[in-house]
Swiss-Prot record:
Keywords: DNA damage, DNA recombination, DNA repair
Function comment: Involved in DNA repair and RecF pathway recombination.
Gene3D superfamilies documented for this protein: Nucleic acid-binding proteins (2.40.50.140), Recombination protein O, C-terminal domain (1.20.1440.120)
Protein name (record): DNA repair protein RecO
InterPro entries for the chain: ARFGAP/RecO (IPR037278), DNA_rep/recomb_RecO_N (IPR022572), NA-bd_OB-fold (IPR012340), RecO (IPR003717), RecO_C (IPR042242)
Lineage: superkingdom: Bacteria
One Gene Ontology biological process: double-strand break repair
Organism: Staphylococcus carnosus (strain TM300)
Similarity-based family: Belongs to the RecO family.
Amino acid sequence: MLMKQKGIIIKSVDYGESDKIITILNENGAKVPLMVKRAKKSKTGLQANTQLFVHGLFIYAKLRGLGILNSIDVINQNYQLRLDIYDSSFAALCAEIIDKSMEDEEISNFNFKLLEFCLNRIKEKDSAQLMSIIVLLKKMPSFGFSIDFDKCSISEENDQSKLIAFSFKYHGVISEQYIDRDPHAINISNKTLYLMDILQKLPIDNMNHLNIHQNILNEMSDLLIMLYREYSGIFFKSQKLINQLKRLEAK
């Protein structure tokens, strides 16, 4: 039986010499894994159309478990997302976070909306790094943890202006009054914590174009990646390339 699904490719893995397995996130928010025969043979026309971020109508034979791709009617190649290595890397991180946050049979329309929001904003030249930060903030509960960025984890006071660090000992942000209780607390600027709280709580439908200083973006990213490693044991493969790019830039 032939099935039709509109969706965006969020994962692509080579399989053997000429095939690949892709995963699409369909418009209902379900993951659909598909085998693509002869995908790496240029004459098939599937090489370009089975890359990350391609949005299309996927027509496939439904088998037990893995579907077999028959053809793709491309809606948007999202080619511009692959032109800049930084944009591409952070867009891949967004897709990977959403992919890993979902069980195989899970359906979440929010996940598709979140992915589409991030890819569209990157194409509109919003910071790709900021988009990955938004996804990391929004998807925390799916990985089994949550952080309040608006109150001290020791006193539970909500005076945002006094928050200056994150403590793994106390599993949250702490105010300047209690900084001596954890000598290993990570200093985080108050503005960074304030903006993380805003981005975590603000619905994506209400987010206008955002412009945040690069130093603050870096501080957010570094903290969030540490949180995910500490509380969920996950390190995202896409982050490895981002780290390599940072090291090259620093030389």
